[in-house]
């Protein structure tokens, strides 16, 4: 009986993603192919799912969009692609998704998503207010003879 339930759940995963091709596409992109109920979609196209049969911490997940702000994000997904209102629900800070109870507007929340620029030339580097302990040596300029 237990084997039948395991096979049934495996078949539900394959059919839940639109067949074998859709299952493999989701599996290779996210390294997991869960099936759950669609809770909502944000303004960027990310889809949020929930399955209460999974244990806590793995019962809510996101399937990222393939294009965001004109950038192809099929293989280049980033955790900062989740808006703040969905972050609350995704990390179980609140039980109500933003589709049923919208998050209050805050002035520090961006209206349009900005990608994480850590490790790129656009990253923020604060100005150093301390003096250098070691000064680099600059040789005196002498004309060539």
UniProtKB/Swiss-Prot annotation:
Subcellular location: Mitochondrion inner membrane
Membrane topology type: Peripheral membrane protein
Gene Ontology biological-process entries: response to oxidative stress
Main location: mitochondrion
One CC-aspect GO term: respiratory chain complex I
Coiled coil location: none
InterPro entries, alphabetized: NDUFA12
Residue positions where N-acetylmethionine is found in the record: 1
Function: Accessory subunit of the mitochondrial membrane respiratory chain NADH dehydrogenase (Complex I), that is believed not to be involved in catalysis. Complex I functions in the transfer of electrons from NADH to the respiratory chain. The immediate electron acceptor for the enzyme is believed to be ubiquinone.
Family indicated by similarity: Belongs to the complex I NDUFA12 subunit family.
Assembly description: Complex I is composed of 45 different subunits.
Name this polypeptide is given: NADH dehydrogenase [ubiquinone] 1 alpha subcomplex subunit 12
Native source species: Pongo pygmaeus
Lineage, broadest ranks: Eukaryota, Metazoa, Chordata, Craniata, Vertebrata
